[in-house]
Amino acid sequence: MIHAILKMGDPRLLRVAAPVERYDTPELRALIDDMFETMAHAQGVGLAAPQIGVDLQLVIFGFERNDRYPDAPAVPRTILCNPVIEPLSGEMEDGWEGCLSVPGLRGLVPRYRHIRYSGYDPAGQRIEREAEGFHARVVQHECDHLIGRLYPTRIRDLTKFGYTEVLFPEMDPNAD
């Protein structure tokens, strides 16, 4: 089932999500299926449960190709419960981000370039991976939703925040 995606200004996006405590349940599987369907419908590269009003530490991400980020390399399809992020260096990298909860806007956001992330899959099996570049950016962006943080709060230079159609006129206006 496709869910409505909460938009910036909705106070539910500012809450800290609760940990997933029960794995491998029909309810968790149904939620994950709904999240993937919602993400695909919105042409997203990731989605966090709080974005559809579910206060759980659950994120999904991954794509082969995405019209909203045409130059981005593929990111493996991942389901991550109770994620933890560890920067593997202090190197930060600025990159343009958008968000399904902040439609039509983009901002230049600093993120760690190289991270390790860990958590659990829907069956409760531990996941641990390293990521760099756009993959690392997507993981950090989605995990921010679990602590009630949206990407505009990370922007250092507000002259690098605006409407996608103004900042990137060459992009398809329906892509964001």
From Swiss-Prot:
One GO term of the biological process aspect: translation
A Pfam family the protein falls into: Pep_deformylase
InterPro entries: Peptide_deformylase (IPR023635), Peptide_deformylase_sf (IPR036821)
Keywords tagged on the record: Hydrolase, Iron, Metal-binding, Protein biosynthesis
Cofactor note: Binds 1 Fe(2+) ion.
SUPFAM superfamilies per UniProt: Peptide deformylase
GO molecular function: metal ion binding; peptide deformylase activity
Obligatory cofactor(s): Fe(2+)
Superkingdom of origin: Bacteria
Catalytic function, reaction form: N-terminal N-formyl-L-methionyl-[peptide] + H2O = N-terminal L-methionyl-[peptide] + formate
Catalytic residues identified in the record: E142
Binding-site residues, Fe cation: C99, H141, H145
Assigned EC number: 3.5.1.88
Family recorded in the similarity comment: Belongs to the polypeptide deformylase family.
PANTHER family named among the record's database cross-references: PEPTIDE DEFORMYLASE (PTHR10458), PEPTIDE DEFORMYLASE 1 (PTHR10458:SF20)
Role this protein plays: Removes the formyl group from the N-terminal Met of newly synthesized proteins. Requires at least a dipeptide for an efficient rate of reaction. N-terminal L-methionine is a prerequisite for activity but the enzyme has broad specificity at other positions.
NCBIfam families: pept_deformyl, PRK00150.1-3
Protein name per UniProt: Peptide deformylase 2
Originating organism: Bordetella bronchiseptica (strain ATCC BAA-588 / NCTC 13252 / RB50) (Alcaligenes bronchisepticus)
